[in-house]
């Protein structure tokens, strides 16, 4: 690949990528979820049966995980689901060559039986606003040309022509909040990091980190973004580094995400070869590069200071704050940390403007949010909806409701740190403030649906077991407190509980909450409170 040195070079590269773009192709969903359901066999079958007849694009997750393995035939948008390798020959002969729809491969409404031919008409997709996930079916994550054809890196070129302060002001005006759980305003965080970088000597090193340590049970939003559209995250990081004044970046991703690691590694190398990473990016004089750090999968390493310890080669355990990472972070240098989804939003804000982004969502929760909708729901998968959509709309309109005629009982949001929201609150808007008011959190985006047969005490026991295993053990209150709470809850599930156990459990929960150092311990009692 020829290294591009100017915005004009990028425009020419973008033009060539558009010329290569095929209007007619089959998009095969091949993220981790698809591969677990046999998508590679579908890929092999298409390469055998359809070679020379249609362009084959192996992509990240299409979102509708319940329908895996699935494909989309473009430009029509024909959606076929639950495919087997032996189905491919018929699809090539009938649909690709003759234009005939094969009814048995279509998605059918679980209640009415109505078949849907086109992806955009399926209720699971129709209700969503897929600003981040919508590009996945069009992008082979190992081919940078696909990203360039979707206006990739044009936002970077635009950002490099304006001042760092102007970029930060755009992010602030957009109202973007961190998508990793805490919901801290991203623009404010960048502003603090920028001031810290400016106050240091010009030669001083500062860092940015992409936190891809996604540890909540049932959550896989970040994994799917990295697998399906890694360049969107990389572009956001480059823009952020330029705005803040950082010159080195890290993507911290757990080693149990091998496909994400593979696709991000390829994307970084391609970006480096073309000049989006390295020295003098697009002739701007700005130098920046990204490295990957693989985590061992410890849940506590999602906490910023523990993550930093892990990158430094130390045991991943939280440190007391202040100083905060923005002041003294990685290797003792100023460090700004955002999660995968936050970084992926940056290029869209630069491209479409702060006003466009802030027009989506609610007063204090702007933009869209990706959720992994799992559990006792008909349409499991990745959903991207505007902030402020109600739980009822997400679970019943997008998710299709509860299977087997069962009744809805509760939905757990925010992972182990979150809470369970009962049926009476189904019309609650899904935004940061509304979820916090009812004792839960947005978290990174996990959403576990439970039906009438789910025992809530068993749910509490499950999360306490998880948290006991994942606690770093540094704080006595967390280490022993979670253990004791789990013992009490276990006794209750085994019929050995006593009435006074409930008061003991409540008192113990508040001690753990109030005396633990990091977010894991501070929110560990949530499953029982």
Protein language model regions, located:
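Hydrophobic alpha-helical positions that pack around
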Residues: 127-128, 261-387, 399
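Ferredoxin-type iron-sulfur electron-transfer modules in oxidoreductases and energy-metabolism complexes
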Residues: 2-24, 39-60, 75-104, 154-170, ...
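Fe-S ferredoxin-like electron-transfer domains
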Residues: 77-173, 277, 306, 310, ...
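Short, basic, low-complexity termini and linkers enriched in Ser/Thr/Gly/Pro
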Residues: 196-205
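Histidine-anchored nucleotide/phosphate-binding helix
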Residues: 229-243
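Accessory "access/gating" subregions that flank catalytic or transport cores
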Residues: 156-196, 358-359, 364, 372, ...
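Short amphipathic, charge-patterned alpha-helical segments
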Residues: 236-240, 388-403
């Amino acid at each position: 690949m020829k290294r591009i040195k100017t915005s004009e070079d990028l425009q020419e590269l973008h033009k060539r990528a558009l010329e290569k773009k095929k209007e007619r192709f089959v998009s095969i969903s091949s993220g981790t979820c698809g591969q677990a359901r046999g998508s590679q066999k579908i890929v092999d079958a298409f390469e055998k049966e359809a070679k020379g007849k249609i362009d084959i694009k192996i992509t990240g997750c299409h979102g509708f995980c319940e329908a895996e393995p699935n494909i989309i035939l473009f430009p029509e948008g024909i959606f076929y689901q639950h495919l087997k390798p032996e189905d491919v020959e018929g699809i090539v002969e009938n649909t690709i060559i003759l234009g005939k729809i094969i009814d048995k491969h279509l998605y059918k409404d679980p209640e009415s039986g109505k078949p849907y031919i086109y992806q955009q008409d399926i209720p699971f997709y129709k209700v969503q606003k897929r600003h981040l996930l919508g590009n996945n079916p069009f992008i082979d994550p190992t081919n940078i040309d696909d990203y360039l054809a979707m206006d990739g890196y044009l936002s970077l070129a635009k950002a490099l022509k304006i001042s760092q302060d102007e970029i930060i002001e755009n992010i602030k005006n957009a109202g973007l909040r961190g998508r990793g759980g805490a919901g801290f305003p991203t623009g404010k965080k960048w502003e603090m990091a920028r001031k810290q970088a400016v106050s240091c000597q010009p030669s001083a090193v500062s860092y940015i980190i992409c936190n891809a340590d996604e540890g909540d049970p049932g959550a896989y939003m970040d994994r799917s973004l990295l697998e399906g559209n890694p360049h969107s995250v990389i572009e956001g990081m480059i823009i952020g580094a330029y705005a803040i004044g950082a010159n080195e970046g890290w993507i911290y991703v757990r080693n149990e995400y091998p496909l994400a690691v593979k696709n991000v590694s390829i994307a970084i190398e391609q970006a480096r070869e073309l000049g989006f990473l390295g020295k003098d990016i697009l002739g701007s004089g700005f130098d920046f590069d990204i490295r990957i750090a693989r985590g061992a999968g410890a849940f506590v390493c999602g906490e910023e200071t523990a993550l930093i310890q892990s990158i430094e080669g130390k045991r991943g355990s939280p440190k007391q704050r202040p100083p905060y990472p923005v002041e003294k972070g990685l290797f003792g240098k100023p460090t700004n940390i955002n999660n995968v989804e936050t970084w992926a939003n940056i290029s869209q804000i630069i491209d479409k403007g702060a006003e466009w982004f802030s027009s989506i969502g609610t007063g204090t929760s702007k933009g869209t949010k990706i959720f992994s909708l799992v559990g006792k729901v008909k349409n499991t998968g990745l959903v991207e909806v505007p902030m402020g959509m109600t739980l009822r709309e997400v679970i019943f309109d997008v998710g299709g409701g509860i299977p087997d005629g069962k009744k809805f009982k509760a939905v757990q949001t925010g992972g182990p740190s979150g809470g369970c929201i009962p049926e009476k609150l189904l019309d609650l808007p899904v935004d940061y403030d509304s979820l916090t008011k009812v004792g839960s959190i947005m978290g990174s985006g996990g959403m576990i649906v439970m039906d009438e047969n789910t025992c809530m005490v068993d749910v509490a026991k499950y999360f306490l077991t998880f948290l006991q295993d994942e606690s770093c053990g540094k704080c006595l209150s967390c280490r022993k407190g979670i253990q004791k709470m789990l013992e009490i809850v276990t006794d209750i599930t085994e019929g050995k509980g006593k009435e006074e156990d409930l008061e003991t459990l409540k008192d113990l929960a508040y001690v753990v909450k109030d005396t633990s150092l990091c977010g894991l311990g501070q929110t560990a009692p949530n499953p029982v409170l």
